[in-house]
Amino acid sequence: ATAVSQLFIGPMADRYGRRPVLLTTSTIFLLATLMCIFATSIEMLLVGRVLQAVSAASIALSRAIIRDLFDRSKAASMIGYVTMAMAVIPMFSPTVGGFLGELYGWRAPFVLLFMFGSAMLALVYFDLGETFTPTEATVGARIKDYFSLLREPEVWGYFLCSTLASGAYFAYLGGAPFVGTQVIGVSPSTLGLYFILVGMGYMVGNFISGRYSERIGLEAMMIYGGIVACIGIGLSLYLMTNFTPQIGYLFYPLSLVGVGNGMTLPNANAGAVSVRPDL
């Protein structure tokens, strides 16, 4: 739902402005969260979760707002800092959610989400001004414009770089639980603690990107990030295949994938949205 909604959230933000769209999606998120809190059936809960996912598509506007405010190089730096902060939540949310669920029941995490959503809505309403002058083009026309973006060779380079970096990360997310529990034999709780390492690596990479992208350039930072990630994958593969598999052989080297992706993805995102700033 989030992926599909992102195809439309950008054109809508271009047509009506960033602020109105964010206010609308934040309100939808709060209403959807209330639906989850007071759900009396699994169907009602699923509808609420889908609506949460739809409203969460507005997360893409954070990068667009940064691009509205800063030039190409500075935008890469700022996106690095923003994604560093965003990496904190996936690191600790499973632990916090499990803790709240055990103490107060399954509705408790949704209450916390409602509190966060309320704070976000207040921040947008009281602090965020409009950063983009809305266009007269219709949403359908803006979507057609996006197809013209696909004819730009440069944007495909950024897309491919982002796709491959993300693919390596999601391959790790899908395979690490099986390898950790079934091959190495660690407990799920221990595995969860090791997962934090890659998240911390991603934060480190985001910090490096935010600190140095403007100085050395987007493309150079993406290359360095790819090299760091490849070193981590190669080292983990060597250790796991040539020695008795251990949990450290899996996660310690793969934390470099987090570092590399933290260096690569903010710059790929900034580069992609800079190819056609008019869109």
Which stretches of residues belong to each language-model region?
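Paired small-residue
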Residues: 28-35, 43-51, 248-256
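Conserved MFS/SLC helix-loop-helix module at the cytosolic interface between two early adjacent transmembrane helices
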Residues: 3-42
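Juxtamembrane intracellular "pre-TM" segments in multi-pass secondary transporters
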Residues: 129-159
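Cytoplasmic helix-loop-helix junction between adjacent transmembrane helices
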Residues: 42, 48-85
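Residue-level signature of mid-helix packing/kink "hotspots" within the transmembrane helices
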Residues: 2-7, 57, 90-91, 199-203, ...
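C-terminal ends and interior cores of transmembrane alpha-helices
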Residues: 27-40, 228-244
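Helix-loop-helix hairpin linking two adjacent transmembrane segments in secondary transporters
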Residues: 44, 80-126
